[in-house]
Each structure stands twice: as structure tokens, then as C-alpha cells.
Regions:
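Active-site region of the double-stranded beta-helix
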Residues: 1-88, 107-116
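Histidine-centered metal-chelating micro-motifs
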Residues: 90-103
Length: 116
């Protein structure tokens, strides 16, 4: 399995301001996930890491502000464990169906646009 990043399209830049299209073709749901300060999603339960896994949707996570570290686990991949330090310039991280995933932010937090 090869990880994919969907590129963003910067259509205008002025001093201190960037305008870009954050859309991902073929998606039908969008949510904004804000981490205020150091946060983990989903949070640990009784000291044990928790993970999301979707059986019927592909997530596309685009950092809007800050940075987010994603842990991806998928036993079907040749390399089943990946840690991605995601920033906006990388584009939207595609998380395939059946992939266990979680994310953390540093002390300053982050904002991510998730399109599925």
C-alpha cells in the first residue's frame, strides 16, 4: 500500500495571506476538527490507545492550522504502521477504508478539515 496525499491548489497569495481550494473530488461529507492545545483524537481510555476505523468511507485530512501527527495501522499493508507529521503544504492525507487511525497535536493545537 502506498500512502496518498491529495494536493491543494493555491490560487492566490498576497503578503501574509494565502488562498487555496481545500476541496477533495468525490467526497460527500466535511467536518472541521479543532484540537485546543495538546490533544489526542480519539482520547485514550484507562491508559489504552483508542483508534478510529471506517469500513465504508475514505477520510481526507487537510491541516488548516498548526500540525497534526497521525498514526495509521493497517494489517493489509506491506508496512502496516505509519507515523505522519502532517502540515498543510503536504496536502490532504488520504486514510483508506479499514485503516486504524488516531491523531495528536502539540502544545499549540491544530485545526484539520476532514472530507469523507
Amino acid at each position: 500500500m502506498r500512502l496518498q496525499f491529495i494536493p491543494i491548489h493555491v490560487f492566490r497569495e498576497t503578503p501574509s495571506v494565502t488562498f487555496f481550494d481545500a476541496g477533495v473530488s468525490g467526497t460527500n461529507g466535511t467536518d472541521v476538527v479543532v484540537h485546543r492545545g495538546a490533544a489526542t483524537s480519539p482520547p485514550d481510555v484507562n491508559g489504552f490507545e483508542q483508534y478510529y476505523v471506517h469500513q465504508h468511507q475514505v477520510d481526507h485530512n487537510l491541516v488548516l492550522e498548526g500540525q497534526r501527527t497521525f498514526v495509521l495501522l493497517n494489517p493489509a499493508w506491506d508496512q502496516s504502521h505509519h507515523v505522519i507529521h502532517l502540515i498543510r503544504e503536504m496536502g490532504a492525507l488520504q486514510i483508506p477504508v479499514g485503516t486504524y487511525h488516531r491523531s495528536t497535536s502539540g502544545e499549540t493545537g491544530s485545526m484539520v478539515l476532514n472530507q469523507s
